[in-house]
């Protein structure tokens, strides 16, 4: 970032709306307008790929595809592909503050299939003018490197009751050319459906991004370093990963015990075969980052430290304690990316156990790292205390992996930590503890400060997005539209402007005093006399 600014972390899934989950529709545009009113410059989101078991956006079944749940149904209706009665009366959940992913899975695809049936009535045909011709063929052409394999993967997966691809019949699991061709021939309509879903996602996303950019808002996206074991990428590109001839991972990803989890984190993602990537000059990574930069303005790369050294866990282990550190590609990867793509607007998530070699890689890359206030209260002059933040970093009170500030203060801090927080941040009841902590982040030297929407709303643990190591109850929280008030936007704008992260609010013009209403003129004695004597004079004149 070239100047001090600030933004809000708000997952697309957490946007308000009536259909079970946030989408790329009017509520997203309303949130962009809220950001503008609040003087913000950046909208940070979580990964937008399709989710699967566990609902985690960091365990997507594709490194390139978009989440079908985010497709706005009202927009499909406006495009003539749905009727409001196709979806408006469906039960999308009983609690509008949380996503019910099981219900979404049961009902969303049925609605999207109705839209696809309408789309087929306007099927793009080369040489004919239809509403979708140009956009459809442009999309399928530009997505040719990943879309066919993704559609094939999803169609086969559905045919096999959504089971992991490693359990499919061997000819399909191991991509026998004859078996794949027979499947394509017999399931052409199903392949078309999955392509249609991705087309609609791309169309709506680009329209939303264009709207945000037109308002001066940059979108900071997020890509996980790894892909899921059960993904189109792993199935179609086994050579990219440490896998045996049957497609089973030899080792899997995770991280050692740390602040978040005493047993470490066993993610289960297949590890990259970095030797293969080096031989191909990181072509797959170039495609992946190019795609990400086509949908985001700024790119946060999760688990940056894994490019220096990564935690490799034997497949089959029950936790992450048995892993060991292995050497990653380092600057070799980022040099290849810069050669192919030019300047890289990347933010490095450099949290967790950080070695000197990771710090050296971050410095050589030139990417800003991250600082998190919730890691700071250890009784020392911690580098995570805001006065120690370098300018070239992104400052957070907490991330999606942390509790909210209120939940953290109430449930996770010790009396000593609360005492330190009160003294360091000069917390007062009048200002409020949460506002005081946010003040500390905004006042820091960091060029960019990002605050979660839940923290601006001063929510408790009920609004936490993710608890690492806990497989249930994550990624569900949603904001209520009524909470995004002009008063809150003004507070955010005032605090951001106070620390030169936003333009000052225009001063209210002083109220002009109303001029006193004109009073009727007082009647003079002469006027009264004139009025009194006038009838007498008239009578006298008549008598003559």
Predicted ranges, named:
Residues 36, 205-213, 338, 362-363:
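Surface-exposed amphipathic alpha-helices with a cationic face
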Residues 1-4, 11, 17, 54-198, ...:
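Alpha-amylase-like alpha-glycosidases and glucanotransferases acting on alpha-linked glucans and related
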Residues 27-51, 295-296, 441:
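Catalytic domains of carbohydrate-active enzymes, especially glycoside hydrolases
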Residues 194-227:
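Conserved, well-ordered alpha-helix/loop/beta-strand core segments that scaffold catalytic motifs
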Residues 1-38:
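Mature N-terminal, pre-catalytic/accessory segment of carbohydrate-active enzymes
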